[in-house]
Amino acid sequence: MLIGITMGDPNGVGPEIILKAYRDDKLNQPFIVIGDYDIISYCNELLNYNINIDAMNILDLGILTRNELKIGQISKESGYASIMYVKKAVELALDKKIDAIVTLPVNKEAVRLTYPDFSGHTEFIASLCREKNYTMMLASEKLIVTHVSTHLSLKNAIEYITEDRVYNTIKLTYDTLKRFIKNPKIAVAGLNPHAGENGSFGDEEIKFIRPAVERARRNGIDVEGPISPDVVFLKAYKRQYSGVVCMYHDQGHIPLKLLDFEGGVNITIGLKIIRTSVDHGTAFDIAYKGIASTRSLEEAFKFAVKLVEN
């Protein structure tokens, strides 16, 4: 088994948390860092980690040097470098040279200075895999959620909801959960207050969500919904459900980050490759200060290993 870890934005916490996790022996399977050797080396020197960098498995792409760093800042150069690491990792995964990818955070604004249409890792990696039926899963020990839509405005996210998209998200969620949970049971959150209360506060539940749930049941999936959004996450937290299908980005992100901010893992499901990610950003404000937590990286790495093994 070999896990590829992309370095993330060089101006952020990515290099630091890779080094710290390696130093503390938190990554329990062979891995290769896809990034820039000189940046990793400089971070090691700056933070006095005294790690033998040459003992690490680093695929040096030679894109950025320490002299080009702008620590804690948005820059076109770092945005370009960070997305090149991702492209190389996907290429390696598609060629079966690595078994999974763990991505460290990029800065969307920095990436857009080179790729103006970039909306996030999830969509970018799916496009490289030429996959249209995919979505984002967030997972922690306390809660698992998936999303019908991800990086859309709230207005557009509501318009994006259809029976087919809700059904596909339920199916993707089920197919992923059953790899590591026996007989998973899925909840589907409503969109509107009280899940619309029979059309009193919107009809998306009647027109799209309930028909998708019924179709999933007919196809053998143990699923319930639509369930009022203000209670469904508590029920899942109490283990009444294995995971919750959410209608839009923040509906799923808020409860998971509230319950387990550092332990969350982002997984792109529906791809022909395995990709997990830390569930935090570049943290420019604390970059290269030696204080960034490695917990999300540890959890993302463990989840990638779990998916490879299952």
Indicate where each model-derived feature is located.
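Short, flexible loop segments at boundaries between secondary-structure elements
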Residues: 128-143, 269-285
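Acidic, PIN/NYN-like endoribonuclease modules and their adjacent C-terminal/linker elements
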Residues: 121-124, 130
